Design a protein with these regions (language model features):
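N-terminal amphipathic/basic leader segments beginning at the initiator methionine
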Residues: 25-75
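Short, solvent-exposed loop/edge-beta patches enriched in aromatic
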Residues: 72-78, 111-116
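Low-complexity, highly charged intrinsically disordered N-terminal segments
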Residues: 77-80, 84-88, 97, 101-106
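Active-site histidine-anchored catalytic micro-motif
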Residues: 31, 35-37, 42-44, 52, ...
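Bacterial N-terminal signal peptides
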Residues: 7-16
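Positively charged n-region of N-terminal signal peptides that target proteins for export
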Residues: 1-6
Length: 129
């Protein structure tokens, strides 16, 4: 639980530090990142990194119809997809999986700083052991 709060704190700080005022003729720079799972502490199963089917870079864009190349929203910003992973509902997430995915995500986010916004695609209730 403490790790989750630490991660959220880091993301919020990165977001705030990375924000800048942009002139109206410059497109906003928006990062995309997120993880999602419904994990149950009552399940004996452990959820590993592979279960998230993590995507990186432009591969992420295909999951958002409103960001397809022909959609008008695609040209309204500069998009910087970092990492996105979604898992089926399962057991507690292993610490190794969580830390690996978070490190990849944070490294990807740091590459293109500063941002004007973050599309933080999260869902569920994640427990990490």
């Amino acid at each position: 639980m403490k790790t989750t709060y630490n991660f959220l704190f880091v993301i919020i700080c990165l977001s705030l530090l990375a924000c800048q005022t942009t002139p109206s003729d410059v497109l906003p720079r928006i990062a995309i990142a997120g993880l999602g799972i419904e994990s149950s502490t009552f399940s004996p199963a452990l959820t590993t990194e592979e279960a998230f089917h993590a995507q990186q870079g432009m591969e992420i864009m295909k999951d958002y119809p409103f960001l397809n190349p022909e959609h008008k929203n695609r040209s309204r910003a500069q998009w910087f997809p970092a990492l996105r992973g979604k898992s089926l509902p399962g057991g507690i997430v292993t610490r190794e999986a969580y830390e690996s995915l978070m490190n990849i995500m944070l490294d990807q986010l740091k590459k293109n700083l500063p941002y004007d916004g973050l599309f933080f695609d999260i869902h569920g209730a994640m427990s990490v052991v």
